[in-house]
């Protein structure tokens, strides 16, 4: 068993991971909502969502780690009050490097090519290209600061997200905070060996190519924007396997459909620069979100 863990440590450990003492190899999320009313009619729709995040870091040497994996997401919801339920989503590859410069500074760059569409047919508009560049300053074993930039070639135009955050673990290892604003934030407290309670924030702006969303609209895209706030319980079946049950609420949520060529010059998290686009559908209300998450984690606390 000791030989097994030593091999696993050599494959998966890096300065990026050791700062947190674990790596989440698999995260699987299943979400649903109650019915949400459209603004312009009595029609209602649910939002069903499935996400998977697989991460495989491979240590090349003491200072360099290869980062690989993939992201998958699928949505089922109405985009038009009088329309059918539409399926759309994305598949993205993760390929990057993590470089340790010295005992304090660590850099990470990850390429994120993806297909984002309804997968009805294939075209160049299905493809998007993203990159994340991140620097981390390790203040102590339990504290580091992070800053960087995310870019993606969204269908509405180039999208830039400056990022800043931190990771903190209390000395008794009961309180943990992992923050990367404006994209996500998480804080949790270990109540018992088997149970953590926490709060979580996720903010996203993404776009997906649509084919024939209605008979009169053959070439469009949907821009999804949401801010989600959750409270959750995490059940720790073992050091590796966990289940989270989350209840949350969405703020400023929308799934807005635009003509394929209706774009802006570029976008930032809080604004878009360029001409005002013509929204083709109506929004529906914010509301509750229920989510269950399975996590498979490799923890190095006891195996160094």
Predicted features by range, described:
Residues 163-167, 233, 283-304:
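Outer-membrane beta-barrel "beta-signal"
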Residues 19-79, 295-302:
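Short glycine/proline- and aromatic-enriched beta-strand/turn motifs that initiate or cap beta-hairpins
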Residues 56-58, 99, 137, 168-170, ...:
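Residue-level signature of outer-membrane beta-barrel architecture
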Residues 26-30, 66-70, 109-111, 145-147, ...:
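Membrane-embedded beta-strand positions of outer-membrane beta-barrel proteins
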Residues 60-66, 104-107, 141-147, 173-176, ...:
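Repeated loop/turn-to-beta-strand initiation elements of outer-membrane beta-barrel proteins
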Residues 71-84, 181-261, 279, 283-290:
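Outer-membrane beta-barrel translocator/channel fold
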Residues 30-36, 70-76, 113-119, 151-155, ...:
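Transmembrane beta-strands of outer-membrane beta-barrel pores
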Residues 44-50, 85-91, 123-129, 158-162, ...:
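Residues that define the transmembrane beta-barrel architecture of outer-membrane proteins
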């Amino acid at each position: 068993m000791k030989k097994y863990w030593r091999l696993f440590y050599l494959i998966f450990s890096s300065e990026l991971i050791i700062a947190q003492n674990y790596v989440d190899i698999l995260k699987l999320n299943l979400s649903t909502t109650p019915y949400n009313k459209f603004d312009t009619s009595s029609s209602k729709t649910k939002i069903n969502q499935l996400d998977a995040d697989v991460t495989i870091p491979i240590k090349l040497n003491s200072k360099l780690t290869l980062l690989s994996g993939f992201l998958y997401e699928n949505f089922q919801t109405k985009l038009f009050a009088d329309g059918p339920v539409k399926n759309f989503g994305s598949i993205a590859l993760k390929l990057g490097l993590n470089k340790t410069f010295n005992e304090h500074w660590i850099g990470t760059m990850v390429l994120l090519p993806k297909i984002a569409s309804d997968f009805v047919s294939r075209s160049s508009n299905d493809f998007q290209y993203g990159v994340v560049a991140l620097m981390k300053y390790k203040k102590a074993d339990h504290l580091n600061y992070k800053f960087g930039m995310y870019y993606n070639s969204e269908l509405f135009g180039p999208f830039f997200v400056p990022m800043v955050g931190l990771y903190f673990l209390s000395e008794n290892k009961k309180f943990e905070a992992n923050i990367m604003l404006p994209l996500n934030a998480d804080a949790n407290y270990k109540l018992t060996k088997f149970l953590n309670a926490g709060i979580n924030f996720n903010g996203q702006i993404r776009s997906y190519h649509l084919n024939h969303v209605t008979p009169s609209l053959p070439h469009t895209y949907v821009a999804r924007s949401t801010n989600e706030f959750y409270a959750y319980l995490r059940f720790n079946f073992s050091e590796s396997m966990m289940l989270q049950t989350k209840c949350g609420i969405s703020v400023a949520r929308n799934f807005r459909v635009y003509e394929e060529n209706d774009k802006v010059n570029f976008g930032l998290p809080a604004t878009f620069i360029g001409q005002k686009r013509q929204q083709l559908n109506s929004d529906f209300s914010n509301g509750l979100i229920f989510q269950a998450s399975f996590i498979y984690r490799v923890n190095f606390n006891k195996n160094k």
